[in-house]
Amino acid sequence: MTETTDSPSERQPGPAEPELSSRDPDIAGQVFDAAPFDAAPDADSEGDSKAAKTDEPRPAKRSTLREFAVLAVIAVVLYYVMLTFVARPYLIPSESMEPTLHGCSTCVGDRIMVDKLSYRFGSPQPGDVIVFRGPPSWNVGYKSIRSHNVAVRWVQNALSFIGFVPPDENDLVKRVIAVGGQTVQCRSDTGLTVNGRPLKEPYLDPATMMADPSIYPCLGSEFGPVTVPPGRVWVMGDNRTHSADSRAHCPLLCTDDPLPGTVPVANVIGKARLIVWPPSRWGVVRSVNPQQGR
């Protein structure tokens, strides 16, 4: 009897050789690697996708806020530099410089812009309208404008640092009449003189002063002669009858020590240039040299 051998194609699967099927879950999982891409996305993946899309603009917003903060800091620093070294606004609180500058305790005073650069390269000249820190002898009776409350005072100092609140010092505004080395004097027969020459002062207004210089040449008490020490200036208000200026601070009608009545040039903050407020008063603060003579 001849044995016959079945060909591989005719061999039937036996118990030891299970038939391979693509439907077998194990085989299918190994062969079709792309199945997850074809499957429908579940709720979690959709939520993650939406969250990612929602979060995309946030870095841009943070960047914008950061840029804004940097620009704000730069602006404050530049403004502080300007106030400290270039120019600063000041409020006129009294009538001592009328009619050139308006001011009173119950009205809207002029706000002026003070140039701080001019006197870094030069010195005050006769006729200049200057803002200066009062010398110690001029500060008698001065009261601090700061609050006694620590928190409020801190806020005031911070605002003063950037120029929104006046500094806590006795800042005054007057016109320069004489400078170091010059001799100023006032007599009823000669009026106000510097180095013996009468002054020409078109900025004086008799109606404002309620006095006529032709009748009352000194517009107050006689004084002098006073020789202004080097490095100092003699100042007076344009409203002579309502101004506590150099005349009010020198002893014995200014015939003794000249220092108390004069102002150190080092105390000069700057030169008044412009009236910036209110709009109806916009204009230039002019320097008029009174020593041109009549």
UniProtKB/Swiss-Prot annotation:
Regulation: Inhibited by 1-(2,5-dichlorophenyl)-3-(dimethylamino)propan-1-one (MD3).
Active site location: 96, 174
UniProt keyword Manganese, yes or no: no
Ranges facing Extracellular side: 88-294
Keywords attached to this entry: Cell membrane, Hydrolase, Membrane, Protease, Transmembrane, Transmembrane helix
Catalytic activity: Cleavage of hydrophobic, N-terminal signal or leader sequences from secreted and periplasmic proteins
Localization per Swiss-Prot or TrEMBL: Cell membrane
Enzyme Commission number, as recorded: 3.4.21.89
Region (Disordered): 1-59
Keyword Calcium recorded: no
Family the entry assigns: Belongs to the peptidase S26 family.
Protein name: Signal peptidase I
Gene expressing this chain: lepB
